[in-house]
Amino acid sequence: MLQHPATDFYDLAAANAAAVLTARHTPPYSPTGLSGSVALHNNNNNNSSTSNNNNSTLDIMAHNGGGAGGGLHLNSSSNGGGGGGVVSGGGSGGRENLPSFGFTQEQVACVCEVLQQAGNIERLGRFLWSLPQCDKLQLNESVLKAKAVVAFHRGQYKELYRLLEHHHFSAQNHAKLQALWLKAHYVEAEKLRGRPLGAVGKYRVRRKFPLPRTIWDGEETSYCFKEKSRSVLRDWYSHNPYPSPREKRDLAEATGLTTTQVSNWFKNRRQRDRAAEHKDGSTDKQHLDSSSDSEMEGSMLPSQSAQHQQQQQQQQHSPGNSSGNNNGLHQQQLQHVAAEQGLQHHPHQPHPASNIANVAATKSSGGGGGGGVSAAAAAQMQMPPLTAAVAYSHLHSVMGAMPMTAMYDMGEYQHL
């Protein structure tokens, strides 16, 4: 492909459009063929070693007859040195000329690329409008990309989406076309909401309108980072979470990101890891607390079970049947209650344990308890008086271990 200064191609595009407009007022296409040639002459006159006079002329001709030849001619001559000329294209050359058009596909693509790089969108639009309706030309990738650029700058977003969704483009054009796709959707979303989009808003737009496969290689991205880039960063982070500025620059070149993006990725990753470690520490502490509580409960259980077994053994060793056992428990409870009352009202008097025992023995014998109850009463009469604290604790333990059948009415003993 020939490389020329941008200003020469501006003139080329303008002259081509003028020639096409002029040709439309002339008689229609002639069977003898339409030949067109674009000649670019560059004459360099070197008058001295310190001054150069450059004269450039651009000629475009469109006429009927003269064969089917056409091409772009670049002639260059120099008076001070050797002369040379470069001729591109020709009537009988290998390039196929478009019907009723003097330029080849390569030349049209070159004009489109130059006008895009120069940012001259208006001239590019006029040049595209002047192209003939030929499938080989209209489906050229450079022409399609130029149409997409013109549609974006004119606000014709539906036409832009149609071009990008229905035509496949090479990977070298994906980045530019992806930017057009996203910017167009951003502009539409901003007009709909009436305010500029932030980072979150743009992320939602990208999720709502994913890139078409015609301009995307299908590789998933995360926060605008491709999986390959993230994999490189993760591998480096596993070895060194704190890369130096030089290492960050190397990573940026390897991943295709900027140094700022690489630095921010490492900062965010370190912050997430610290938060995860803090959360794990809190969970471990709660687990240890619950384990210690369980151990304390387990250490208390044997003593409680031993106490319960001792109470059961005392109940089993008491003589008599079930009624006798219940009466013995009644007698013990009455003794402790009486001792507690005697200490509260008459601390200077001894416990009336003998009277309480006699009353309990009489009541139990009237109920048919037998001699077992009398023996228990006699044993209780011989017991020394108990202190208030010991009596209360013993009463509490006996009441807790007493079955429901052993409950009695304390109103019967109010006279005591």
From Swiss-Prot:
The lineage of its organism: Eukaryota, Metazoa, Ecdysozoa, Arthropoda, Hexapoda. Required for visual system development. May transcriptionally regulate genes necessary for optic lobe invagination and Bolwig's nerve formation. SUPFAM superfamilies: Homeodomain-like (SSF46689). The gene is so. Signal peptide: none annotated. CDD domains: homeodomain. This is Protein sine oculis. Residues 32-91, 262-329 are annotated as: Disordered. GO terms for biological process: Bolwig's organ morphogenesis; circadian rhythm; compound eye development; compound eye morphogenesis; entrainment of circadian clock; glial cell migration; insect visual primordium formation; positive regulation of transcription by RNA polymerase II. Residues 273-290 have a biased composition (Basic and acidic residues). In developing embryos, expressed in the eye disk epithelium, bolwig's organ and the optic lobe primordium at areas of invagination. In adults, present in photoreceptor cells in the apical regions of the retina, and in optic lobes. Disruption phenotype: Flies specifically display visual defects. These range from reduced ocelli and ommatidia number in weak loss-of-function phenotypes to complete absence of compound eyes and bolwig's organ in more severe lethal phenotypes. InterPro entries: HD, Homeobox_CS, Homeodomain-like_sf, KN_HD, SIX1_SD. Belongs to the SIX/Sine oculis homeobox family. It is found in: Nucleus.
